[in-house]
Amino acid sequence: MSLKGKDFLSVHHLTVDEIYQIFDFARILKAKQKAGEPHPLLKGKTLGMIFQKASTRTRVSFEVGMWQLGGSALFLSSNDMQIGRGEPVKDTARVLSRYVDGIMIRTFSHLEVEELAEYATVPVINALTDLLHPCQAMADIFTALEHKGELKGRKLCYIGDGNNMVNSLLHICAKVGMDISVATPANYAPDATIVEQAAVAAKLSGSKITILDDPLAAAQDADVLYTDVWASMGKEGEQAIRKQAFAGFQINNTLLQAAKKDTIVMHCLPAHRGEEITEDVIEGPNSVVFDEAENRLHVQKAIMALLMAD
Ligand code: CP
Ligand code: NVA
C-alpha cells in the first residue's frame, strides 16, 4: 500500500487503511513539529499552489507545511497566470509538471481538477472545489479522533448547506464507520451522487447515513456538531435568498442541548457568527474550531510527504 505518486482529489478514492496511514503519519509529524525536531522529508521539492478562489488557512498551511518539510511552495494566483486568460488546463498541467514536484489547486469546477490530474505527471492535491473539500474533511476527522479517541460508532451531525464540505464529510464518515446525519433545507441537499458513493462505503463500514431537513432531529445524541457558511465562495450573489432559506439551520445553544453533553463543535472556517453558528457556541467550551484549523497543517504535511517524498 503506497500513496507515492498518487493524486489526492477525493476521500472517496482512499481506502480505510490509507486514511489511517495519513492520520498516523500526521500524528508523528505533529509531535515532531511540537518538539522542534526537523523532518525535511521534502528537501529540495517544490509545490505549485494554484488559487482561483480566496484562502487564509489553505494557503498558509500548505505553504508553511512545505517549508517545515524542507521544501518550498509557490503561490500562483489564477489572476496572474495564463490559465486565467484561457490557457487550457491540460497545457498548464504539463508545463507545471516540468517545474514542480506537486500541484495543489483550489478552484470552482471539480472536472477541471480531474483534468489537471489526468495531464499532470506529478501528484495533484484538491484544495477545494465546488464539489469537495477533502483536505479539510481529513483534518476534521483527525481532530475528532484526537478528541474522541475512536471514530467507529460515533455520530457527526452536519447542519446547513449541502455543499463541498458536507460532501467530503459524507465520504469520510462512511469510510471510517462514523454515523452521519445531515440537516439541510430541502432545496439545498448534498449531491445525490456523493450520497450514493457514501452509502456504498457505509455498507462496508457499518456507518448510518441520515439526510433530513430537521436540525433538531439530526442533532440528537451527536458526538460532533458541524456547520459551514450558508453561501460558499461563488454563491455570494445568492446571499439574501439563502439567508431566508437557511433561517433555523444554525448551531446555537438549543441545538447543542440536543447533542451529547460532551459533543464537539466544528466549523471549517471562515465563520459567519449569527448565521450558521452563534457567537456563544463558536467561542464556547465545546468548540474545537482552532484545533481543526491547526490540524490542516499536520494532516496536509502527511499527505504531501506520502505523495511526494522519494
Ligand atoms: N477552511 C478553509 O479552507 O479555509 P480557507 O478558505 O481560509 O483556506
Ligand atoms: N463551503 C465553503 C468552504 C470554505 C472553506 C466554500 O466553498 O466557500
Question: Residue spans of the language-model regions?
Answer:
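Adenosine-phosphate binding glycine-rich loop
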Residues: D262-T263, L269-D310
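Rossmann-like adenosine-cofactor binding region
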Residues: V200-E279
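Short, structured coil segments at secondary-structure junctions
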Residues: L69, Y99, Y119-T121, V176, ...
